Amino acid sequence: MDSPFTTKVTILHQGHIGDIIAFIPIYRKLNATRILVTDAAWGEPMTGYKYDSLKPLLDSQGIPSDLNQFTSSIDYDTTNWRECYKDHISLMDSQARYLHVVDRKTGHMEITEPWLKVEPNESLRGRVVINRSARYRNDKFPWSKVVEHYGKDAVFIGTDHEYNDFVQSFGQIPRHLTKDCLEVARAIAASKLYVGNQSSAYWIAAGLRIPLLQEVYEHAPNSIIRYPGAVYCFDGNIDFESLPK
């Protein structure tokens, strides 16, 4: 039970799963104690399966959350954070700039360690975890070569549509079913490499600081966190020798 003397700091967040995972280092920097997730006026609402998927991951990180629970005690409101959105900066920096956590024009969040910690799913230890969502694709990215190179170790996570689209386009690989973002995180945490495009699964991989290879959408490279082992492919050229074997 919280002490009555504990300072409570409540965040109102209007964004999607990836936006919220990218926001976690900002949440901690603000010493926040609760996040209230609300449906945005744009895009698919968080109400339903999206919030239901995200909540177990937030719970596992010690982040209390509620959905569409409005209150007068909001300390930080991110509703208009996209005022600071730019295609060429990360979703994390856009949100940090909006809340003046960093300079509003040029600020950058320095991330030097993982911001997510989960128990790895040991059944996937040493596998290459792949996800490809419908948005933010780059036709130059050599997915067929990735499947050829890592096929025996590869496993796909994602929706039925994402999986069917992937295997029809690039060849058969097995699928690992996940029911929520926490299970996605546990799968990625056990992997030797994560490969995917700009999606919530990417933000989980970056939060875990797992070696990764990203299919970068050249027109909006808004999901890049630099760290050793993170490779961002803009032009379709991949040096497989530099990646985990």
Indicate where each model-derived feature is located.
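Catalytic machinery of carbohydrate-active enzymes
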Residues: 1-245
